Amino acid sequence: YYVPRIDKKIVEQYKSDLIVLTGNLYGEVPSKILNLGDKQAEEALQWWSELFGDDLYIELMRHGQEDEKRANQVLIHFAQKHQIKILATNISFYTSKAEANAHDILLCVKEGEKQATPIGRGRGFRFGLPNQEYYFKSFLVFC
């Protein structure tokens, strides 16, 4: 695993003065919505809520993916049920939609893959973003 991360014991130890977001689809709460079920996701959300109170925000993203739509529906329900504020965010890997192909080429160079190789998981596939919606969006486009 190559992305830095911390465990909950460290979060508990250094929780003061932190603001916490539930994260993207790989965050604990959205991931549990998609992979384990709403009950487990809600239990995880309650842990974060008890620890951070008003400093916890439910993060919503819209990159045009079906799994995001499913997670967002449940996250909005949780926000209303538990009175947790919502924050809209967008993962950005490039500044404009026109740069999506250049970013995909960069990923191919990094991984030593050809762009013609299909995006997916496992043998015969390569890493890539699911669509071209990972650009920095203006306020009007974002809303």
List where the protein language model places each region.
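Phosphodiester-processing cores and adjacent nucleic acid-binding clamps
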Residues: 1-143
